[in-house]
């Protein structure tokens, strides 16, 4: 199991998960990645918002995979799994089947079917035994878990909080908590398989660069809200004292609230399970 540290882009703020397949005899060394997408896809942004985005499985040489993450300054941790030859053969055959063109595309879901859960299921679902994980974090919700990772990105957190509904605040199961790469890595590290540790050894393939997250916009959502409230108060007092209607300001208010209403209305039809009930 490969666990990659977070990146700067919004879609990389929570890290990434991949599978490494290494055959010592043949020298074949591959990274299997379930997080391939293209912003050039037709209507990518609207489809992503509505939960209709298709991701795909990708396979590339391990050295190219590492070179990409090295260029981005992101770390990669490898966990070598303690599997039997039979387990490895079954997983290899399952990967070969998954690599067929008819099987590489899947409907992405941020919480329940993403690059991390796909990698986990490919490994765990093809083992000849039971994997035992540590107990689930009792009070963890989807919202609280992502807040741990985007607390330095206030606008990303604000946008997600704006869209996520009540289903994001329910308690989660152990399986659901593994949608985050670091959660899965930690669980694998503490898990047992047929009475033995699931992870045989852990290697740091790339060390993450310690970069301080810089806000994309200098003002926080709270700052903008306070400024907006102050301006609204001033405009209200001016309108009252001068007995004058400021049409431009009223128009801006109506357009802003109207656009927000349209967005919330559209999200009713989103296929994201934690968004529609907002």
What role is predicted for each listed range?
Residues 83-96:
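A structural motif
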């Amino acid at each position: 199991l490969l666990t990659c540290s977070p990146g700067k882009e919004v879609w990389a703020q929570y890290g990434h998960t991949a599978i490494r397949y290494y055959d010592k005899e043949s020298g074949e060394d591959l990274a299997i990645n379930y997080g391939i997408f293209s912003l050039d896809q037709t209507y990518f942004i609207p489809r992503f918002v509505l939960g209709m985005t298709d991701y795909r499985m990708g396979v590339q040489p391990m050295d190219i995979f590492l070179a990409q993450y090295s260029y981005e300054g992101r770390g990669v941790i490898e966990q070598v799994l303690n599997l039997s030859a039979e387990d490895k053969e079954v997983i290899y055959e399952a990967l070969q089947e998954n690599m067929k063109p008819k099987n590489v595309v899947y409907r992405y879901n941020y919480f329940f079917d993403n690059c991390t859960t796909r990698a986990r299921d490919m490994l765990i679902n093809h083992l000849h035994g039971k994997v035992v994980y540590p107990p689930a974090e009792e009070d963890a919700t989807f919202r609280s878990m992502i807040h741990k990772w985007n607390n330095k990105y206030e606008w990303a957190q604000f946008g997600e909080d704006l869209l996520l509904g009540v289903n994001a605040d329910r308690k989660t199961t152990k399986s659901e908590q593994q949608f985050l790469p670091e959660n899965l890595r930690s669980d694998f590290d503490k898990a047992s398989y047929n009475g033995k540790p699931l992870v045989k050894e852990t290697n740091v393939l790339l060390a993450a660069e310690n970069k301080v997250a810089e806000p994309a916009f200098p003002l926080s959502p709270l700052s903008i809200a306070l400024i907006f409230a102050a301006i609204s108060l001033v405009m209200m007092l001016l309108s009252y004292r001068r007995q004058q209607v400021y049409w431009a300001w009223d128009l801006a208010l109506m357009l802003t609230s109207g656009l927000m209403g349209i967005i919330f209305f559209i999200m009713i039809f989103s296929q994201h399970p934690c968004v529609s009930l907002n």
